Amino acid sequence: MRHEVHVHADIPILEGVSRRQVEQALGPWLEYLDADGLSDVKSLEPDEPGLKYDEKELILYICWTGEIGRSFHPALEQALENLGPYCYEAVEVDLTEYQDNGEQEGKLLFVGPTAQAIHEAQRRCMVEDLDAILGRQFDKEQVAQVTALVNRLFDED
C-alpha cells in the first residue's frame, strides 16, 4: 500500500564535504527513488526543491513530498545514518505521512555526527517543545521544574 510522505530538514554539512560524498551517503534513499543524484529528486509539490546541497552555505536542504511504499523507511533511515559523519551538528528531520483516510502522522528523525550529538539534539527539541507548550499555561519557574526533570531523564538515558 502506497501513500504520500513529506520530509523536511536543513542539515549543516562539514566543510570539505563534496556533493558526490553527500550523494553517496544518501545512496539508499536515492536508489529507492530511482534517482542517479540529488538533481534527479523531484517533489510531487512543484514549489518544493526536493534535495538540494548548497556547497557555498554547506547545507543540505530537504523539502520533498513523494509517494512511498513499505521499503521507504529503511532506505531513509540508512541514508541518514550514512550522512551522519558528514554533518556539522545533529538536527531533526521532520517526517509527515499522509494516510488515505485524510489523517497525517508526524515523526521526528535525527541525523548527526555522533550518537551523543543526536542525543543532545533530541534533548534540545524536547525541551523546546515542552517550553512552548507549558509556557502557555505555567510561569517560567514551573516550566523550569519540568525542564530539569527532562534533562535528568536524558542524563540517565
Locate each region found by the language model.
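Short, extreme N-terminal segment that most often corresponds to the first beta-strand
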Residues: 1-31
